[in-house]
From Swiss-Prot:
Name the UniProt record assigns to this protein: SsrA-binding protein
Molecular function per GO: RNA binding
Annotated function: Required for rescue of stalled ribosomes mediated by trans-translation. Binds to transfer-messenger RNA (tmRNA), required for stable association of tmRNA with ribosomes. tmRNA and SmpB together mimic tRNA shape, replacing the anticodon stem-loop with SmpB. tmRNA is encoded by the ssrA gene; the 2 termini fold to resemble tRNA(Ala) and it encodes a 'tag peptide', a short internal open reading frame. During trans-translation Ala-aminoacylated tmRNA acts like a tRNA, entering the A-site of stalled ribosomes, displacing the stalled mRNA.
Main location as per UniProt: cytoplasm
Subcellular location: Cytoplasm
Organism: Sodalis glossinidius (strain morsitans)
Keywords: Cytoplasm, RNA-binding
UniProt cross-references to InterPro entries, sorted A to Z: SmpB, SsrA-bd_prot, SsrA-bd_prot_CS
Disulfide bonds: none
Superkingdom per UniProt: Bacteria
Length: 160
């Protein structure tokens, strides 16, 4: 019998959209597959992805990842015309798509990409149903974060 491959230590995360958590209240998260071409998978294995400006576009009953940049490798993309900014189809269940359409159309939410990661041999994208933050919400988040840091510093020095 063959042994199971041991999981290599390290992160399975390829890219994160930290700005999305700063600019939006994330109400609900979904995990979606991505429809990719061969050169895109190779560039993702090399970690050449950026989802900072990406969002999810809903049209014709399907969801698409728009604005994500996958930088092509020169070795892997010599015989193919590569478009690093192409729109990629998201693979979701019908129930999940209906939920997304309902919240975006009726309640005024938007859908943003939060992170890109490996799950076994598949590339997955975590998307979030989000509502935009106001400026004062961002300031309160920053104040809360700074207070947590100050609190941990005080506790560290108090224990000495």
């Amino acid at each position: 019998m063959t042994k199971k491959k041991e999981h290599k230590p390290g992160s399975a995360t390829i890219a994160q959209n930290k700005r999305a958590r700063h600019e939006y209240f994330i109400e609900q998260e979904f995990e979606a597959g991505l429809s990719l071409q061969g050169w895109e998978v190779k560039s993702l294995r090399a970690g050449k992805a950026n989802i900072g400006d990406s969002y999810v576009l809903l049209k014709d009953g399907e969801a698409y990842l728009f604005g994500a940049t996958f930088q092509p490798l020169t070795v892997a993309s010599s015989h193919v015309v590569c478009d690093p900014m192409r729109t990629r189809k998201l693979l979701l269940n019908k129930r999940e798509l209906d939920s997304l359409f309902g919240r975006v159309n009726r309640e005024g939410y938007t859908v943003v990409a939060l992170s890109l990661y490996w799950k076994n041999a598949w590339v997955k994208v975590k998307i979030g149903v989000a509502k935009g933050k106001k400026e004062y919400d961002k300031r309160t988040d920053i104040k809360e974060r700074e207070w947590q840091l100050d609190k941990s510093r005080i506790m560290k020095h108090a224990s000495r």
